[in-house]
């Protein structure tokens, strides 16, 4: 029986330097003459041996994660200005950001042709890990499937990764057949992304860049002259959308 170890080549940008192999075929050269062209994972293997195999193992999940730069809008872009408007608007009253987060999830899902039913916002201090509730419908009539969507909203510093403990708290609330949504003005660390992917959590992640882009589109489609006008309209509905209800109640509403 053989175990195969596929080594990571992230440091090389997934590009293999064949000059290493060519050098190994040259009888006049030994390993010390050619190893500098080898992938970093191979050099680590020579140094550490089998004890370092998990660190150098290729991970498909790692390839699916997004680096921080891809989760933050470009400086002075429309998305960047929108994101900063959002953060400034809710500064000092971040609980009210939940109304915007709920609407962003609704807009995002419907834009992807998902049938979504808006639910309610949970009052501050009583959410237990859920800031807003919605429902995803699949199919029609007798055979229709209804899924509870449990949402978490975090209006936090744009340049600091969102806390993994908040993600864990959201996931812990998900029951069988539920899906989650996590909306942040910030970004997700690689560790958090890998955990979500490896454990196959049914969790929609919306980072700061996606948030800024979606809100910009929402404002344009609604005919508002600025993002702030949209934020004011949504904020005016906050109190009327609060409700003390169990998430399961969305299935019969």
Predicted regions and their residues:
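Structured alpha/beta reader/binder surfaces that contact nucleic acids or chromatin modification marks
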Residues: 1-16
